[in-house]
Amino acid sequence: MRPCDKIIIQTIELTRKMLDLADEGEAVQEDRNCGVLYGVVRDSAYRIKQLAEAEKEAHIRKGWWKE
């Protein structure tokens, strides 16, 4: 697998961790600002995941992606 493809996979894995962190944070939040923070983490994770998956698809279409 190409190094850039490994980074894309790691990025997608990171977004899963970010979503888990947002879930955990929301479960224990003590004030509204924490909720805002975890909402930003969640939104960012979804956006990063979307970009990483689009890049993965581009690599697949170009024939670069080897698993």
What are these regions (language model features)?
Residues I7-K17, L21-W65:
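Short, charge-rich amphipathic interface segments used for partner binding and complex assembly
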